[in-house]
Amino acid sequence: MVRRVVTGAHYGLRDWLAQRITAVVMIVFTLLLAAIFIISPPHDEASWKAIFSNRWMRIASFLFLVSLFWHAWIGMRNILMDYVHATGIRLTLQILVILSLIFYTIWSAEILWAMEMA
């Protein structure tokens, strides 16, 4: 009789669920934005600003972007863990991915919330 010992951190289910949840958030936002563009297509900069000047739209956009970046992090981390076997290179690449995603999140927030002042 063979006894099977299951070890590991069981990140697979959590990652799978996080990717599905972030995908649903992105799909809902995309459908919302598509509906807005179909109902009232923006033709100039003032129309674009009108769409994104509402606080709820900026919050929804930021939630979309955080979901996008979290989704990207999970995917990139899994790709790097699966295909980059040298620990030093993998760690360096993961740090670069994290730093770039943090930078893009802050930059996106700055763009979204700076619209209020413009």
Regions of interest found by a model, annotated:
Residues 1-118:
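Membrane-embedded alpha-helical bundles that constitute the cytochrome b-like, heme-associated redox core
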